[in-house]
Structure formats: C-alpha cells, structure tokens
Design a protein with these regions (language model features):
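Hydrophobic anchor at the beta1->P-loop junction of P-loop NTPases
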Residues: 7
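Conserved phosphate-donor/acceptor-positioning beta-strand/loop module used by diverse small-molecule
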Residues: 97-98, 116-138
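The conserved Walker
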Residues: 11
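Conserved glycine(s) of the Walker
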Residues: 14
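Conserved nucleotide-sensing/catalytic segment adjacent to the nucleotide-binding pocket
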Residues: 42-100
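Short beta-strand-centered segment that lines the nucleotide-binding/catalytic pocket of NTP-utilizing
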Residues: 29-43, 52
Length: 221
C-alpha cells in the first residue's frame, strides 16, 4: 500500500526545487532511476518512489506544471494514473505537486484514493508568509501563466483550503503548512531524518548561456 505525498502551492513557491533535492538525495544514496510513464521511478533498499513530472533541459525535476500526461490533467485522471503505477511497479511513495485551488476536491478523499492502493495521505501547503513575497517570487521567476487575481484569491483562501482537508477527519493523513523559505532539503529531513546541504539548484539554461558568454569574453580579453 502506498503513501500519497502532495505538495501544494502557487507557482514559484519552490515546490519543484524541494522535490528535485529529494530526488538528488536518493540518487546520492545509490538509488536506481527509471523513466516511466509520467515521471521517474527511484528504488532504494527495495522501496520504490514515484515522482510525477519531468526534467528540464538543465536536469532539474519539475512537477505538476509540466503536465507530463498531456491533456490528462484532471485530478481523477492523475489519481488513476498513480493507481496504475502502484499496481504495475509496486510503488511505495507517490510524490506530486498540486495547487491551492484543488485542495478542497472530493477527489482527495480516502474513499477515492484507497481503491487505487493509497492508504496514507500527506498534504503540505508550501507557501510564503505574505502575499507580497509570493507575488515577488513569481515576478523574479518570470511566471506568466498564472493570473495575479487568481494567485491572490488562492493565497487568501489558503487556511480555508487546509481546513477542508482537515475536516475530512480521515485516518493516516497529515496536513501541514510549510514555509516556501525552508531549507531545500526539508523533505529529506522529513522522510529520511537526514540532511543534504550539498544540494545546489541547477542553473537555468539562460544562466548557463550567460556564463558561457562571459567565459568567452574573458578568454578573448
């Protein structure tokens, strides 16, 4: 039976960064990695971890916003896909991202998840302390596919969304608020009681190109 780990937050709330760190940690410990439908299957000490997403050109993992199942982006379709991965590969942990505005969905009730092989649910609401910090992060990350009003609305209703999940009052469930500014190895500490301070966020393609340009200019000089 599997544990469903869903990290919720607006765009640019560093969800993918934390999951990328967790993947890199597992690989540093000798985990094997297999590319499977919709993501990656990592195996360490006979425990299987499925990360739903894809990798960018710089090698960094990115989650839900990559929409690895193409048009199949509804919650029911995603959960059915997770059930398929659990059945076919014997997955023990499913790591995925979500947005604040889907957190009250009935699709996350245990009555829908348990038939898929999910017996434990861990929800983490990863957010900045203030709306201003959230909007500034999106500005710095040049997020263009999220409407500002939608971000503000979701942020203001964050506590209501959390309460909806808590009110389900179902067993084997964690609902926790996490600062987007916590260490990148937060989930390494949470699930492995370990740390991974050597993790570095991969440079973006733009940063790599700029660094190469600077190197060429220095050589010419």
């Amino acid at each position: 039976m599997a544990t469903y780990v869903n990290i919720k937050g607006s765009n640019a709330s560093r969800k993918s960064t934390k999951l990328d760190c967790l993947m890199k940690y597992l690989l540093s410990k000798g985990a094997t990695e297999e590319t499977v439908e919709g993501g990656y299957l990592l195996t360490l000490n006979d425990v299987k971890y499925y990360f739903f997403g894809k990798k960018r050109k710089n090698g960094m993992f990115t989650g839900l916003d990559s929409n690895p199942l193409g048009s199949r982006n509804g919650m029911r379709e995603r959960h059915e896909h997770f059930g398929k991965m659990i059945k076919e590969y014997g997955v023990d942990y499913v790591f995925t991202e979500g947005y604040f505005n889907n957190s009250g969905s009935n699709q996350e009730k245990m009555e829908f998840l348990k038939p898929l092989g999910i017996t434990h649910r861990h929800f983490y609401f990863q957010t900045f302390d203030t709306l201003e910090e959230q909007l500034e992060s999106q500005r710095k990350r040049k997020v263009t596919n999220t409407d500002k009003k939608r971000t503000i609305n979701a942020f203001n209703k964050l506590n209501d969304r959390m309460k909806q999940l808590q009110d389900y009052n179902e067993p084997n469930t964690i609902t926790e608020k996490v600062s987007a500014l916590v260490e990148n190895d937060f989930y390494v500490k949470k699930y492995f009681n370990d740390s991974y301070p050597e993790y570095e966020i991969p440079k973006s393609i733009e940063e790599i190109k700029e660094a190469e340009k600077t190197k060429i200019n220095e050589d010419e000089w």
